[in-house]
């Protein structure tokens, strides 16, 4: 796991793992797992993300709009746009392949990711 958080009060329960593509230099594919009826944190970052839903049901907030998610659906998150994902299924994890350009963006900007995420337990990291 490269990142995760759990906060019962905010209904946050998720983890992020790096998908294995050893030759990838600028793309950084990740598997996001969100527990049933839970969220990941509302956050933003410098890298772009393309979400492909592997399994489960939910919705993703991109800016001001909630968009439905189901297996096979795609969602795009532009740079520096506030976003959050919600698993709406009562029993099944929501699993998403997130393809990002984090490798390229972090090479240009340095390690900016920790400044834009919520600390464990729900306190802002930055």
Per-segment meaning from a language model:
Residues 1-26, 111-126:
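A short, N-terminal "cap"/entry segment at the start of jelly-roll beta-barrel domains
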Residues 13-17, 28-44, 79:
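Conserved short histidine dyad/triad with adjacent acidic residue
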Residues 31-35, 44-62, 99-102:
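Short, conserved beta-strand element in jelly-roll/cupin
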Residues 40-42, 60-61, 77, 83-90:
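Short beta-strand His + acidic residue motifs that chelate non-heme Fe in jelly-roll/DSBH
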Residues 48, 67, 83:
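Glycine-centered loop/turn positions within well-structured domains
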Residues 64-80:
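Short acidic-glycine-tyrosine-enriched beta hairpin
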Residues 76, 91-110:
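A short hydrophobic beta-strand segment most commonly corresponding to one strand
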């Amino acid at each position: 796991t490269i990142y995760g958080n759990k906060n019962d009060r905010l209904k946050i329960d998720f983890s992020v793992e790096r998908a294995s593509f050893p030759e990838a230099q600028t793309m950084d594919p990740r598997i996001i797992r969100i527990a049933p009826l839970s969220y990941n944190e509302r956050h933003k970052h410098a890298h772009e993300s393309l979400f492909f839903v592997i399994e489960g049901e939910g919705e993703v907030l991109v800016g001001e709009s909630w968009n439905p998610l189901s297996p096979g659906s795609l969602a795009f998150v532009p740079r520096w746009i506030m976003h959050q994902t919600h698993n709406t299924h009562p029993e099944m994890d929501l699993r998403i392949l997130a393809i990002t350009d984090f490798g390229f963006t972090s090479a240009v900007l340095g390690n900016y990711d920790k400044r834009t995420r919520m600390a464990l337990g729900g306190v802002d990291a930055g």
